[in-house]
């Protein structure tokens, strides 16, 4: 694996950016339902096509002045490393109480796994109990992940991983910590 080591260093709020990490909104936004709006901390369902247009403009602007990294691409690189994959999936399964999905997640390709971790993993319906469960997802979509500044930040020479108050956002911090 070709790893790039990042030097995290911010000495100014107004200095030149050397790189940014973005997460372009995707299917996780479309997976939002009227029922999940409140849990996702929204007042309404987002229009993905509008959000994508705005994000494309932001990304194009940033690409003119700095290096832009996409969360999903960085996550795929993390998941290509077996030790990092085991650690991240173990933490996610433990935190979100989905230990019975560990093997299924570990068997996925890195790209598929990155997609499922962000877009959501539908729950198995293999029993009457799971059929009657109100929740469609074993791993909820990360509706808010395009706010990458919420889960992590750089202060001086250190990356600060924020612990999110809402359970739905904890996986965002775990992913950013792994990256």
State the predicted function of each range.
Residues 1-179:
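The feature marks the mature, well-folded catalytic cores of soluble enzymes
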């Amino acid at each position: 694996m070709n790893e790039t080591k990042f030097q995290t260093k911010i000495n100014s709020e107004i200095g030149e950016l050397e790189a940014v990490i973005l997460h372009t909104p995707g299917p996780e936004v479309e997976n939002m339902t009227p029922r999940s709006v409140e849990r996702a901390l929204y007042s309404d369902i987002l229009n993905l096509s509008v959000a994508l247009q705005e994000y494309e403009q932001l990304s194009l602007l940033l690409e003119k002045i700095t290096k832009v990294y996409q969360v999903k691409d960085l996550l795929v690189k993390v998941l290509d490393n077996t030790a990092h994959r085991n650690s991240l999936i173990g933490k996610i399964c433990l935190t979100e109480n989905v230990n019975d999905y560990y093997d299924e997640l570990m068997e996925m390709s890195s790209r598929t796994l990155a997609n499922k971790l962000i877009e959501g993993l539908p729950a198995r319906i293999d029993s009457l109990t799971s059929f009657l469960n109100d929740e469609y997802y074993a791993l909820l979509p990360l509706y808010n992940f395009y706010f990458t500044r919420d889960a992590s930040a750089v202060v001086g020479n250190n990356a600060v991983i924020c612990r999110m108050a809402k359970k739905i956002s904890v996986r965002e911090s775990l992913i950013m910590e792994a990256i």
